[in-house]
Amino acid sequence: MIQKVLNILKVVTFSLLVADLEAQDTVSVKNWTLEKQQLNKRGMVFLTSWASVNIASGTAALITHSYEEKCFYSMNSGWGLVNLVIAVPSLVAKPKTYSNTQQLSTDLKRTEKIFLINAGLDVVYIGAGIGAMEFAKSRQNIKEKEMYRGFGKSFIVQGTALLFFDAFMYQMNKKLRIKVKANQQQVALFVSPSNFHFIYRF
């Protein structure tokens, strides 16, 4: 009789502990989801602002007399339009939700990879800009020379700015994922008729 009562108490205790762990996990997921959403929003606001500045600077191409500057500002304006197309949908899209920390951690890892790939492309853009400016030196035609210099400068400026942006977003997403992963180490309880067993989940 006493053993049965003890077993019942174990089951009740186990149920209460599991419920408490699930409640804590739900609260953590909500908090970290909000943090991820705010991080993404800040990033896209920055990208939208940078895009708007570059589009606005395109007007300088209409008033400058330097063909090199015309090419530089025109290319910047083109970059701005592309960045705007990327940033605006992300700002207005419905935020993602997650049912548990594992889903959130997986999505953060995927986001890290995207920013890491983008950072690699940024380095390529910078290299292309340097290459264009070097190529300009071999051109005899003045306008052609100025065109390559203008486009090259734009690629270097845009590539550098985006490299800092992507590197920052990569690092912030990684930092959040590490924090989420650390919390995934939970203590669960397994109840048998005679014993409690502790299981550490990583």
Task: Go through each PLM region and give its residues.
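Membrane-interface helix-boundary motifs at transmembrane edges
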Residues: 64-71, 142-144
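Loop-to-helix transition at the N-terminal end of transmembrane alpha-helices
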Residues: 67-83
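Alpha-helical transmembrane segments of polytopic membrane proteins
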Residues: 46-50, 75-80, 119, 155
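Helical transmembrane-bundle signal
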Residues: 51-61, 80-90, 125-132, 159-169
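Juxtamembrane "helix-exit" motif on the non-cytosolic side of transmembrane helices
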Residues: 59-65, 138
